[in-house]
Amino acid sequence: MKRYFNMLAVSVLCSGVMLSSCTDDIQIGTLDESQYDNVKELKGAVRDANNGKTSTIVELRKKDYSTAVEFRLSRVPKQGVDVTISFDAEYLDTYNAEHGTSFKLYPADKVQIQHDGKIVMAPDDKSSYSLDLIIPTLGTDEFEEDQTYLLPLKAEVKTDGVSVSKKESHCVYLVKNLAGEGNTDRKPGEKETFFFFEVNDTNPLNALQWKMEDGRYLVNYMVLFAANINYDREKGEVYIYTNPQVSYILAHNEEVIQPLRKRGIKVLLGLLGNHDESGLAQLSEIGARDFAQKIAAMCYAYNLDGVNFDDEYSKDPDLNNPLFARPSTVAGARLMFETKKAMPDKYVTTFQYGYMGGEDYVDGIEAGAWIDIAVANYGSKGRPMAGMTKANCSGQSTEMARYGAIAVSTAKDVAESEYGYYMVFAPWAANNQGSKTQFGYLSNLSEGLYGCRLIEPKFYYPTTTSLKTNPY
């Protein structure tokens, strides 16, 4: 894994300006202030107080989900502001129509909002105090397994002079009921791990062998590395290519992927360039929209938790092809934006390398709305973009395949930082000395992040069998 001035003309121009200023009357107080209207306007928005986002994925197992909501203003209001945050059942149809989804409505009578959703902001408050929000887990008779339920909250301002757009007035929670004995929960303030599994060498099920002394699993997010973006010249379309190992894992979804998910490990499809003119950061808007639909279709078909983008190994595109564009951070951001739009209840993550992860906005929407996690290259820290914080980024990255070592102190530095993730690439898991050495480093990671070491594995899962399948 791995960017004269022509002094005579200026003089003449300045002279012209000076001469005209001598003959024209000086006008005072005629400044057009309309250009500052947006600066003066007082705007509001409702957000999740913990992550600052308008859309949050919630996975329910055996415990209720607790978070908080708050109302934010673009500037100090200089007056008291009254706000009410409430459940908005009517927003379901609007949301589904905008995203092409078929989510169901989370039961309104189960939602618990502190103080009945009422907020009073002081004249010098830009952000309100937080209101606790409880999303209870429900029984299987009320809650279908793996069905996404929309919990839409709406902010209504009772005070004149505060404008709230339709989009900024809503904060949604995409709630899933996940059956199984999930045990990857982190305590408040604890960081999460983000692993890339080189599936050509390592069976993903080995993540179940890395269990901490307190009974929790070490791996939070697992990227199946990797499927590829490719171009079919005969059909004239961009598609997802899966090599024999990735094909086998997808075909044996219930035996390989779902056991991980049922224990709380989020499984993501890795996407990588593959030595042709298609590339993750060189698709046109049309090309990005089409490819995003293919990504979403695959994630839904195989019940994956999302996708990770890695912009490497692509050739220069044919700019006469309407599916392609010049490689750029703008094109990379467009693909992530379209992918999140196509599957809002899935995770969209990026390896901040090449042209992926370098734009703050797409169509005026900040990156935090369409990037869930950004992990950095080795020796670097993730860079939060608009709408993101360090908590959405990795604070350290280690490549195990090249004998990358992890010290307890390194992991502890991340644990004590503002960053939210520790990234590990290509860990081995086999009955050999190299894997045993790596296991010691992973145990150091566990101790540094969580204060306890890993339990020695009793066996390892062998590498998966190859299987050739058709491109998706």
Language-model regions, residue ranges each:
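Bacterial N-terminal signal peptides that target proteins for export
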Residues: 1-9
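Hydrophobic alpha-helical transmembrane signal-anchor segments
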Residues: 9-15
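C-terminal motif of bacterial Sec signal peptides marking the signal peptidase cleavage site
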Residues: 17-21
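Secreted glycan hydrolases and related glycan-binding modules that recognize and/or cleave
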Residues: 23-82, 88-110, 120-472
